[in-house]
Amino acid sequence: NMIIDCNEVRKKILDDVKEEVGKLPTTPKMAIVTCSYDEPSQIYVKNKVKTAGEVGIEAVHFNLDPKMFYDTDELADYVKRLNQQYHSIIVQLPLHEKFNEKQVLEMIDPLHDVDGLTNENIAKLVQNDPRAIVPATAQASFEIIKHDVGRSDLSELNVTIINRSHLIGKPLFQLLTNHNATVTVCHSRTADLH
């Protein structure tokens, strides 16, 4: 068993992002939308806003009450309009149960899709297109693995992922296999996981 200190990788990523943001002619603006009564989401968003500010990105949190919207179409239209005002958008999941998450996510312009959850970005990742926007936790996990092994080509590396979510497990599986790792995916229904 090995413990990896991720702070060094995190610092490098944030320093690199801050440097790139500093070269831009304008301050990037990011919209973060919550529309649920999920308390952990509020904590995640608070941390995202703080981290964005640290690297020079202006993050605006739209904490929407699900009662404001009659149905998915209304919320999806709201998110679609944000594409005109913001450079990037996060729809923090989960949304309230009355909304179809996929329909709302598809209203994000794929170039503005911070979490890489639009069909276009998922397809790019599967096709190993370098323009794919990848969910942050999956990308960070991948960067940590590359840093730990000291190379980008992960040939002969065997990796077990214990997660199959669309935010972490599935995109991390794709990133690793795109870089020649051999990957096993386990989850809550995997028998005899020890």
Question: Which ranges hold each PLM region?
Answer:
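Positively charged, low-complexity intrinsically disordered leader regions
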Residues: N1-T26
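Short beta-strand segments enriched in small/hydrophobic residues
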Residues: T27-Y37
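Short, ordered loop/turn segments at secondary-structure junctions
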Residues: C35-Y37, L64-P66, P94-H96, I122, ...
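Glycine-rich phosphate/diphosphate-binding loop of Rossmann-like nucleotide-binding domains
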Residues: Y37-V49, A132-H194
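Short beta-strand elements in bilobed, periplasmic/extracellular small-molecule ligand-binding domains
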Residues: A52-K67, V183-C186
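Non-catalytic terminal and connector segments of soluble metabolic enzymes
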Residues: E54, R81, I108-L111
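Short, well-structured alpha-helical segments in soluble
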Residues: D73-Q85
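Anion-binding alpha/beta catalytic cores of soluble intermediary-metabolism enzymes, centered on
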Residues: I90-L154, L172
